[in-house]
Each structure stands twice: as C-alpha cells, then as structure tokens.
Amino acid sequence: MSSSRPASSSSSRNRQSSQARVLAQTTLDAELNAEYEESGDSFDYSKLVEAQRDGPPVQQGRSEKVIAYLQHIQKGKLIQTFGCLLALDEKSFNVIAFSENAPEMLTTVSHAVPSVDDPPRLGIGTNVRSLFSDQGATALHKALGFADVSLLNPILVQCKTSGKPFYAIVHRATGCLVVDFEPVKPTEFPATAAGALQSYKLAAKAISKIQSLPGGSMEVLCNTVVKEVFDLTGYDRVMAYKFHEDDHGEVFSEITKPGLEPYLGLHYPATDIPQAARLLFMKNKVRMICDCRARSIKVIEAEALPFDISLCGSALRAPHSCHLQYMENMNSIASLVMAVVVNENEEDDEAESEQPAQQQKKKKLWGLLVCHHESPRYVPFPLRYACEFLAQVFAVHVNREFELEKQLREKNILKMQTMLSDMLFREASPLTIVSGTPNIMDLVKCDGAALLYGGKVWRLRNAPTESQIHDIAFWLSDVHRDSTGLSTDSLHDAGYPGAAALGDMICGMAVAKINSKDILFWFRSHTAAEIRWGGAKNDPSDMDDSRRMHPRLSFKAFLEVVKMKSLPWSDYEMDAIHSLQLILRGTLNDASKPKREASLDNQIGDLKLDGLAELQAVTSEMVRLMETATVPILAVDGNGLVNGWNQKAAELTGLRVDDAIGRHILTLVEDSSVPVVQRMLYLALQGKEEKEVRFEVKTHGPKRDDGPVILVVNACASRDLHDHVVGVCFVAQDMTVHKLVMDKFTRVEGDYKAIIHNPNPLIPPIFGADEFGWCSEWNAAMTKLTGWNRDEVLDKMLLGEVFDSSNASCPLKNRDAFVSLCVLINSALAGEETEKAPFGFFDRSGKYIECLLSANRKENEGGLITGVFCFIHVASHELQHALQVQQASEQTSLKRLKAFSYMRHAINNPLSGMLYSRKALKNTDLNEEQMKQIHVGDNCHHQINKILADLDQDSITEKSSCLDLEMAEFLLQDVVVAAVSQVLITCQGKGIRISCNLPERFMKQSVYGDGVRLQQILSDFLFISVKFSPVGGSVEISSKLTKNSIGENLHLIDLELRIKHQGLGVPAELMAQMFEEDNKEQSEEGLSLLVSRNLLRLMNGDVRHLREAGVSTFIITAELASAPTAMGQ
C-alpha cells in the first residue's frame, strides 16, 4: 500500500483506510469460503491465498456472493451438543423454535422425581414456564422482563420432569428471545445467585495479579494473562493472539503443556480469521467449541416465521465446517476464545469528553485469548463468564499500555527531532543529519536511508545503489510530481518498475521532499525478515501438505502474502518524518522573510508580559485560596521543611501556623505514615505527582486527645518560572469523620441504618448491594448527589441497572470505567482489601460527578460476607477551585515552555542568516580591523548557541545541573573583547566610560578551558555593572593572573577578574538571589547571575561582591590551564 502525504488528520486517515481494508478483506473471505464449499477435498488453501494476493482488484459484481456469505455466517441453523436451545416469543414467552435435542434434555421423565401430572410436552407454542419448577420459572420470567435480558445470566432452573438443574443463558435476537440451556454437571457446585457476581470469585486471583503489574511492558502483561488463563481453565495451550494494523495476526504470547509444538511468533494471514468472525467476536466476546468431531444439532423453527432467527449471540452456535477442519488438522479438538476489545484510536484519548458511553469513540478488536485442548472439553458458563471478565480487565490494561507506549514514543521522537534540529541549525546543511550521530535512521525504524542533495547521493546501511536512488527520484518526479512525500510498504505494489531489481532487501520506502530536487529516503526490508519463529521448526521452507489447513501452513501462506512487502509505516512515523521535512525546508530556505525578525521581538515581548501578568494573578489567587480554604493545605520546600500551613490545617491539628513553619513534615505525621509521606515527597520533587494518598497527621495542644487527623492528599509540585520543582504543596481533604463512620458501621451492625440515613452533612453518600448484586442501600446524601430517590434504585442490579456504561440510572463514562467498578465491587465481595479509587458518573440531570469511591464488605455475626457498602467522597468547592488554579498554573508554565521552544526555533533562523552574512564578508577584501569585528561577531554567535542549548537542561539554576564545559584553546583577549562588545551600546546610551586595565601579557595569554562560558560569565557581570551604574559613570576591568606548576610542562592558571563600577551598587535582593539566600521568585537578572556563578563553580572558581563608598566591585575567580604556546614562551 502506498500513499502520498494527505492534509487530513492521522486518525481520520487511519479510519478511512481501515474501513476500506475491512471491505476488501470481507470480499476475499467470501471468495475463500466459496472456493472451500465448492472444492471439497481439492481445496488448496496456500495456493488460493497466494492467488488472491496476485489477483485483480475486488469488483463490485461480487457483492451478491459477499451478502450470501455473511448471511451464511450469521444465520446458521445448527448448534453444538453441550446444551439445547429455545427461541421464545417476546410477549407470550411461547416457543417458536427449538433444537432437536431440547425435548430429550428438558422433558425426559426421571423415575427419581415422582409426579402425578402428565409430563409437559415441548414443541412449537409451548410456554417456557411450564417446563421448569416454580422457583426456576419465576427467576426466568423475572429475567425475561428486564430491558437487558442478559443482565442476570446465568439463571439456575430445574426441569419439572427430571429435577435436573440447568443454566439458562438468555439473550435478545431479532424478533425473539434466545435461551441456551446448559446442564449443571453433578460434580459442579451450581452458582445459586442470579447474575455474574459469583463468577468473579473464580477469576479474583488472576485479576489481582494483573492489577498488581507495574505497567510499561506489553509482553509481561500478555505473558501474565496467558499464564492465569492457563491455570484457570486447564486447557493444553493458551495463546495471546494479536492483530496487526493490516489485520494479519501473530501469536504474541503462549504457554503449553509439555510436549506440544509451540506456535509462539507465528504470523497468520488476515483470512485465517475472517472479518465476519471478528464482527461476531465484538458482539459475543466468548466462543467455546467443545468437540470439533461431534455431530451438530439442527434447530426446528415454526412455519411461516416473518424473520430468520439469528444464533449469533448463542454460545451453542455450531462452528462452520472450514473451521472444524482447521481444528482437526492441528489436533485441537476443543477450544475457548475470549475477545480483547480496546479503544479504536489510542491517539484520540485526550479528546475524550465527559459524555455517556453511547457517544464515545468506537472500539476495535485488539486480539484474542485462545485456548486449545487435544480432547473434548466443556467449561461451565460461570467459569466462561469469569474468563470474559478477565479479558475485559486485560483490555483495560492493554489500553493503558497503549498510552504508555504512545508517551514514550512521542518523547523519543521529540528528543531525536530536537537533536537533529540542533545539528541542522549549527551546520545549516542536511549532510550533518546523514553523516553525523545521531542521524535520520534514528528518527524512525528502518533498515537503510539515503539523501539526494545537490545531485549527489549519501547512503546509510541497507540502501539502494546511487544509480537506483537516482532512478527512484526520477520515478517520483514522473508519477508523484505533486506529492511532497510518499510512504509505501511495497515498491512493487506502488508501481515502481525497478522493484524486482531491488529484491527482498528493499521493499518499503518513505520519502520526504525538501524541494523538487533534494529528497530524503528511508527504506525497509521485507516483512519476513522481521518475523521470529518460536519453536524448533524454524525453517519456513519445510514441506507441508498445502491442502491441510494448519498453523504452519498459515504461516507459509502469510509469508507468500507479504512477499515484496515491508512492515507498514505508521502515522506517527510519517508525522515525525513530515516534521523533519518542515524543519529542513525552513533551515535551507534562502529567501528569508524580513517580517519574521521584526515580529519576533513583539511576540516575545507580548508573551513575556502576558505570562508574567497571568502568573502574578495565579500566584495571588493561590495564596488567597490557601489562607482562606476550608480544606487543609500545607506546603514544604525542597528539603521537606514546612513553608505553608493554612488555618484549616492549624484548626484540625491544634498546631499553630507559626509553630508549624520551619518544621520537617515527617515530624508532623504519625510514624505509620512516614514511609507514605517520604515516597510522596520524593516523587513530587521528581515531578511525579501522586493523587488520593492517605496519611495521618499528629494532633497537638487541645486536639492531642482526639487522635490523629486522617487526610486524603493530592501532591502538587511547586515550580518556579523555569518549571523547576522547588517544593511540594499538599491539597488535602479531612477524612477523619468519614473513617469513624466506616469503622463504626463495620463494628456495630445494628446501628448502620441510623448512620446511613442520617441527614447530617458530615455523613458521606453511601450505597450498597447484597451478595447477589442487588442494590440494598441508598442514603439521603446519595439521593442529593445523584438526583435518584432511594425507592427508584433499590432492588435493581447495582452493576448493570444503577451503574453501567449505557442505559443505566447513573451512566459511566465508558466501558473501562464500568470494568474498574466491577473489579472494585467484586473485590470487596470476595473479601479482599480495597483502596480508594477515582470514580465518575453522570447524575440524573446529565452533570458529570467526579469523586473517590471506597468499597467495604458487609459481614454478618458469623463473619460471612453478606454484601458490600460503598462510600463516595466528593471534593469540596474549595478543593475543586484549588485544583483548577493549580491546572491554570501548570498551563501557564506550559505556555512559557512553548514560548521558549518557539524562541529557540525562531531565533536560529536569523542566526543562520547572520552566520551566512559573516562568512560571505570574510571572502571579501577586508582589512585587519574589519576582520577583528567579524571575529567578535562569531564569538557572540557561539555564545548564543550555547545559551539556546541550555534550554534542554531540567535544572539549569542548580549547582548539580548538567551544564557542560568544553575544553579548547583560546586567547583571553578574544573573551574580553567579545564580552565588552555586548555592553557598548548600553554604555553609549548612558554615557558610561568602560576601561580595560589589562596588561599585554594577560591579553595575549593562550589558555585551555571553556572560552565561550567564560565569555558568557564576563558579559553577564558587565551587564549588571553597567545597568546599576549612574549616568556618566565609569566601569573598569582589571585582572590578576597566577601560574602554578603541577608538572614539568603543565601549569594551572588562577584567573582573577575585577569589575569595578560607580554608584550605589547592585541591589541586595539581586545579590541574595545569586548567592541563593532568597527563596522567593527569581528575577531575570538574578537567574542570570546564579547561572554564571554555577558556571564559575564548575571552573573551580566563584564570585565575590565588595561594596565600598560610592564604588562596588565584582571579583571573579576561575581555574584554567596554560596552552602549549604559552608553555613554549
């Protein structure tokens, strides 16, 4: 597939290409199925797949065959033998269709069950309630009355004639209700509760294991879930099967019993799992085949039904003969498959708005959890449901891994783009990003790259020859003349005539045109080179019977499909290439735009003024909020010393503000909370802000006897103007009363109603459910919060009717939120300790409520769990306001960071123009004095580049920052002249005379060190001296140079520079900022002096400031090494 660079967004491009791919693939599936049905024993799977790849494009005339194929898939009239099926009229509950084995299974008389009545007969028109005992019939009738009839699955019923128990599994189909009946085995303990809550206990251990994973590795996640499913179900083989972007599949993770051939690493063509089957997996997320050799059972329908009964939602639906043959060939007699459904586009996560699930983004099938067994195997419905829930939890974590991978990917690409941009700005030539390190191959994954520039070719690793590069460029100019870029996973399919000559090593290509003649290329080899084989049979050329559909034959077919193809280029890779293309065009554009330089100062000035005004307003608001908030707020500096303690914190703890300030935070919390606070403080100082952390604070004075104060805290890193973390602010919520209520509730069973229904505003919103999942409690605070009265929600299913991702009283944001709530509720019912979790739902009026939720088990006197109680905590208006202000502060910091990035990018373009102008001047007839001025300009240019590079430093003002020193030989005269030149215009404006009382020996001294940094330091202190000198004053520079021998031919030079100026001197506040004695916000001058002082300390030097009558002096010291030229003298 090849594509030019479109203007639409990557998500829309992705969606359109996906739809087109699915339509084309469905047609191919239909063709294969038709060939199979017609060919019989002569069916050759491998040849057909290869023929489809090389065949003509899909024609519209085949649509009838596709429709027939889809109808055949969806409307089969056969079921498997592990149960029986009834289809019921929705209004009367009379039978309108039944499987041939249903009468025998449901109405056979058992001699062990005495009966005086005639046994019921099962046929068309039979009322389903007549077949079962009263209790089972009532439960079934109740379930059939729900809008979501599957909500109570499985329903335990007993046959009236035989007394045999069955699981009734209900779902709605077009025009009717379909009920599967699966017998409960004598060895199986039946699930006595309606609904799915009991199934959770079966998967509780596996879910806890997945929940405890740290994240950051998709491979670890998949290996864990595969191992847990293997242990839970007992199948011989369990695999995590992942679909790739082009719909082909891969066994990503696998575990088997000893002796089985592994399939790990096998890739399968997209036709192995047809699109119609994938659609069914999206609707019915668990599929079980008990015995592929068993005879299927027919379904008998009433005559003249106005619709076809669809068995798509039935677990009993029989597999198609093609799939049965595949299973037989691979000796997989039984299988169990769970769908893993994730968000369709992880790139759009940040665009998700607070809307109910039905308005949310679509889902896609990420892959399957596949279980195989070498003998017939039946898994009861409760265990299947547990596996389905486990797959849902797994899908939530897959989504999280997508997000982590996306963040890491963006970070790495951004880092690489920055490094390549820096190289371009320094050299102003694309050759530097090809010949240097890193280079363009580090930007995206590829096997080779090339640059065509000025008619010449530069090649990297596995790239075509120079003549082939020219040939590709000619083809691009001829066929894709109007395109600024191109990406293809197959040059052969894209129509490049020379693709065959390139062979398998050059299949895919991405192109970025700098201009009509200069082009960047990236190349990829064929896909098979990327494929790994997981077992001993690692030679794909081993002979197989091409007529027997088998995993290794599918792998061979896949290799045929991907011949002459590479891995596809993803949207984020093309975005990275496109960004580099824009940078290259801007850097190499000879026609500069004068308006850019003129508008730059205005834009920077506006940003600066707006940013400072906004920051001052935010800071003032933060201070006011902290002092007046009705929630406790405390703050510490980088050493953990308290520098903020509001009145609410003082009121709760009994510790006055004056007594708290200056004390270490760890001395104020309970011993049991010290590790928690230490971790929270450490992470916050690293910029990682934890949320909803609970710890206990000591009480003092009159509050001492009340016990510790329990706080739930959000950590907010305090940052300075340059986004450096300088402390931590803790925005807390007092949970002491909440904890007392919970403790009292769990201890005193008889008092719970008085507590729950107390209208006291201190009582939080509380709701509960019994052990079967029915809502059993809903207090007054919950009614006020949600808008739903107690009698409107009691005796409804808590998970499904009260809370659900759609069609519930309180809709949740999406399916992931529902799964998380299920885990929390079921964990409490299983007796596990649960932590508070973020929770959100839409109230009756459609307003989205964000809160914390804690679930606690309810026990009877005997210690048996009889239900669950949930406590909701909603943040106060003050806390919400404080969080909004914090967000505004973070946005302001982000604005300033973007401004810095913009400045850095925009400044480099005019700097490149200045560099070009100076180089051009050097080639003209200049006298010695003019050449000196050009040399001064070059030195100032190097200084600017050095300062711009410092913007990458995370902590530029800290002594331990990564500011580097480059050792090179330089003349002290060059440093002084360049530094003085930077203040001459200011001196002329104020009438200040600047004099350099420097001896000739000093000026001609050649030394080793970082001359650019020394120049930066000297210019900073000169600027400050000039700024705070009176009009008409003077500034004097003097020096002292001492050599210390440390060997026969090596000397260390102790350099001392004095900058003396007239006037009152530099303000004390500025000096305090330079010497880090002032923790307040730093000014621009203070920051500049602090950075210069840190640089001096890296040079084993420092700065002192002397203030005398009418005169002030900076004394600068540094340690350098003498250069060889000086040693020779």
Curated annotation (Swiss-Prot):
Domain of life: Eukaryota
InterPro entries from the UniProt entry: GAF, GAF-like_dom_sf, HATPase_C_sf, His_kinase_dom, HisK_dim/P_dom, PAS, PAS-like_dom_sf, PAS_2
Keywords, sorted A to Z: Chromophore, Photoreceptor protein, Receptor, Repeat, Sensory transduction, Transcription, Transcription regulation
One MF annotation (Gene Ontology) recorded for this entry: protein homodimerization activity
Chain positions covered by the region annotation Disordered: 1-24
Residue stretches making up the PAS domain: 618-688, 748-822
GO biological process: detection of visible light; red, far-red light phototransduction; regulation of DNA-templated transcription
Ranges of Low complexity composition bias in the record: 1-21
SUPFAM superfamilies: ATPase domain of HSP90 chaperone/DNA topoisomerase II/histidine kinase (SSF55874), GAF domain-like (SSF55781), PYP-like sensor domain (PAS domain) (SSF55785)
SMART domains for this protein: GAF, HATPase_c, HisKA, PAS
Binding site for phytochromobilin: C322
Post-translational modifications: Contains one covalently linked phytochromobilin chromophore.
The GAF domain, residue ranges: 217-402
SUBUNIT field: Homodimer.
UniProt function note: Regulatory photoreceptor which exists in two forms that are reversibly interconvertible by light: the Pr form that absorbs maximally in the red region of the spectrum and the Pfr form that absorbs maximally in the far-red region. Photoconversion of Pr to Pfr induces an array of morphogenic responses, whereas reconversion of Pfr to Pr cancels the induction of those responses. Pfr controls the expression of a number of nuclear genes including those encoding the small subunit of ribulose-bisphosphate carboxylase, chlorophyll A/B binding protein, protochlorophyllide reductase, rRNA, etc.
NCBIfam families linked: sensory_box
Listed name of the protein: Phytochrome A type 3
Organism: Avena sativa
Name of the encoding gene: PHYA3
